[in-house]
Amino acid sequence: MTMQYINQTWLGKKVILGQTDIDASKPVNVLIGFHGAESTPENMLIHGNRLSLTNTVTVYPEGPVDAGNSVWSWWLDGPRQKEAVQQFLEFTSSMIDEAHRFMKEQNTANGFHTCLWGFSQGGAAALVYALMGKYPVHKVASICGFLPELPDITAKNEPTQILGIFGTHDDVVPSFLADHALDEMKGHGHTLSAKETPQGHEVSAENIQDLIRFFES
């Protein structure tokens, strides 16, 4: 199914919106895709454009942290990472507000589900928001994701369905870090489907098929 894409600006940040033919009588998935560190929405779109999804609006936002050279991150590593992750949570809640506003303008009679996915730091972003974000999410997928140092807040998000994919040959996010992050999510009551593959730090064709099955089920 062909996606039609448009560029918008939300919260002063670039957002690439994709939309299939929408059947407003059925629930719509709003799928937010988080790019990796020091990257762009366009790089995430390269992966996301391979997703053949029905009744879905895709949202590829630009990260809030300027990493220089026209690339962006969701937070910076370092001694103030807890504060940076807290700022990410607040930014993403505001971005979800914008996505909800957009969807309400589409007159979706039976509502919509907010879903998240991401690669690398984007996978971490999806997991962090599922764990500590303001708004509940319907489904979350992480490819080569991890958990950063988390802020000292006690608020927890509602449990959701999580697909976590990681590779034994990933030389950027070691498999033990990804596996630990997914165990943490399970320990907080989330329904977890974890898949270890022989891949490196990448989004493979097999990953794309797993994502399609997950979000279409």
Predicted regions and their residues:
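Short beta-strand/loop motif that positions the catalytic acidic residue
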Residues: L163-F166, D170
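Flexible "cap/lid" loop of the alpha/beta hydrolase fold
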Residues: S70-D77, G145-I162
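Gly/Ala-rich beta-loop-alpha elbow adjacent to hydrolase catalytic centers
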Residues: W117-G122, A126
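Serine-hydrolase catalytic machinery in alpha/beta-hydrolase-like enzymes
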Residues: I6-A109
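A conserved short beta-strand
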Residues: Y135-L147
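Conserved alpha/beta-hydrolase "acid-adjacent" motif
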Residues: D171-L177
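Active-site signature of alpha/beta-hydrolase-fold catalytic machinery across serine-
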Residues: I46, V128-M132
